[in-house]
């Protein structure tokens, strides 16, 4: 799990034993759930785009979600949700 000093952490779409995580759109789903957590708080229409604090991406061809520390500073429960998602699904975190 991320250190307290980390400015971001990456949830990789690989389990700790190296299997690809399913469903294939998991990163977009997680980022979609987190879309309301953003600078200035939730606002009308912001569910149509990802939060800058929780963004789906690719790292070395592997789907991932990049989670910024600013999310923790704004809402520790949302941060914990992302950490617990990775832990509950046995996903690699960088």
Specify the residue positions occupied by each region the protein language model found.
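Short, compact, well-ordered microdomains
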Residues: 60-94
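Glycine-rich loops and low-complexity Gly/Arg-rich segments
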Residues: 34-38, 90-93
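Short, intrinsically disordered low-complexity segments
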Residues: 28, 35-73
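Intrinsically disordered, low-complexity boundary segments flanking structured domains
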Residues: 1, 52-54, 79-80
């Amino acid at each position: 799990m991320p250190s307290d000093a980390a400015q971001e952490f990456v949830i990789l779409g690989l389990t700790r034993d190296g299997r690809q995580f399913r469903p294939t759109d998991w990163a977009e789903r997680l980022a979609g759930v987190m879309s309301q957590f953003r600078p200035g708080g939730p606002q009308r229409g912001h569910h149509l785009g990802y939060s800058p604090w929780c963004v789906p991406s690719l790292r070395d061809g592997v789907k991932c979600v990049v989670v910024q520390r600013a999310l923790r500073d704004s809402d520790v429960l949302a941060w914990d949700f992302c950490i617990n998602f990775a832990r509950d699904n046995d996903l690699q975190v960088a």
